[in-house]
């Protein structure tokens, strides 16, 4: 029973209580770049979740056989291999989205969330818990990406997943899109607003002053 409770905590904790973007402020760079559309935000979230989960799993499985002096190199090799697999799958089955994501899929290799969970969690924890931790952190990352992507695409272009929701004036409708929301800096402010909302709801996440 305690194992099931711990597993649930590992899976759901990073979504709100210990969100990698909102609390730890990790992985922000890719969040700024890929959230102009919900479609790219979703694919990026799935890609990072897969890489984080499986890198955690594989690193945890061999953690007792990795010399401390080369552990970062081993972790990077495993993560890079998984990123290459994910990138090739995207190019094979979702080429247009792969083109839109551009270099940001490859940059998952250096994403702080993936590296951080491998070093801080997978190196010290059994495989199943490490795998679920990777999924949980991927879901936490994805939740922020989807929230930001929803606002940016809906109010920046009047659409969701490419389907027109708010009919634009240029097409005979009533809505004037806010072009600023399609620029990367808008994501920075939206993430800041989300962090403020979460920390207002959960004041224990606010850093102590002084």
From Swiss-Prot:
Topology in membrane: Multi-pass membrane protein
UniProt-listed GO biological process terms: sodium ion transport
The entry's keywords: Cell inner membrane, Cell membrane, Ion transport, Membrane, NAD, Sodium, Sodium transport, Translocase, Transmembrane, Transmembrane helix, Transport, Ubiquinone
UniProt keyword annotation of Glycosyltransferase present: no
GO molecular function: oxidoreductase activity, acting on NAD(P)H, quinone or similar compound as acceptor
Matches recorded under Pfam families: Rnf-Nqr
Disulfide bonds: none
Primary location recorded for the protein, binned into one broad class: membrane
InterPro entries registered for this protein in UniProt: NqrD, NqrDE/RnfAE
Transmembrane annotation, as ranges: 14-34, 42-62, 72-92, 103-123, 131-151, 178-198
One GO term describing the cellular component: plasma membrane
Catalytic reaction equation(s): a ubiquinone + n Na(+)(in) + NADH + H(+) = a ubiquinol + n Na(+)(out) + NAD(+)
EC number(s) reported in the record: 7.2.1.1
Localization per Swiss-Prot or TrEMBL: Cell inner membrane
Family label: Belongs to the NqrDE/RnfAE family.
NCBIfam families per record: nqrD, PRK09292.1, PRK12405.1
PANTHER family named in the record: ELECTRON TRANSPORT COMPLEX PROTEIN RNFE (PTHR30586), NA(+)-TRANSLOCATING NADH-QUINONE REDUCTASE SUBUNIT D (PTHR30586:SF1)
Binding partners and assembly: Composed of six subunits; NqrA, NqrB, NqrC, NqrD, NqrE and NqrF.
Biological role stated in the UniProt entry: NQR complex catalyzes the reduction of ubiquinone-1 to ubiquinol by two successive reactions, coupled with the transport of Na(+) ions from the cytoplasm to the periplasm. NqrA to NqrE are probably involved in the second step, the conversion of ubisemiquinone to ubiquinol.
Identification of the protein by name: Na(+)-translocating NADH-quinone reductase subunit D
Organism: Shewanella sp. (strain ANA-3)
Lineage summary: Bacteria, Pseudomonadati, Pseudomonadota, Gammaproteobacteria, Alteromonadales
Underlying gene: nqrD
């Amino acid at each position: 029973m305690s194992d099931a409770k711990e597993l649930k905590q590992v899976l759901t904790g990073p979504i709100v209580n210990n969100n990698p973007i909102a609390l730890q402020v990790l992985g922000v760079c890719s969040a700024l770049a890929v959230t102009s559309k919900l479609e790219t935000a979703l694919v990026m979230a799935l890609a990072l979740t897969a890489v984080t989960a499986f890198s955690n799993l594989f690193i945890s499985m061999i953690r007792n056989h990795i010399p401390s002096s080369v552990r970062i190199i081993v972790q990077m090799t495993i993560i890079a291999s998984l990123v290459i697999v994910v990138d090739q799958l995207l190019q094979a089955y979702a080429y247009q989205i792969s083109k839109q994501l551009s270099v940001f899929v490859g940059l998952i290799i250096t994403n702080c969330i993936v590296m951080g969970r491998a070093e801080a969690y997978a190196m010290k924890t059994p495989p199943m818990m490490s795998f679920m931790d990777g999924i949980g952190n991927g879901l936490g990352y994805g939740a922020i990406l989807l929230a930001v992507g929803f606002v940016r695409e809906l109010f920046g272009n009047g659409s969701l997943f490419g389907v027109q929701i708010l009919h634009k004036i240029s097409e005979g409708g009533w809505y004037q899109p806010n072009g600023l929301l399609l620029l990367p800096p808008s994501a920075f402010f939206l993430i800041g607003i989300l962090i403020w909302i979460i920390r207002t709801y959960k004041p224990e996440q606010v850093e102590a002053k002084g």
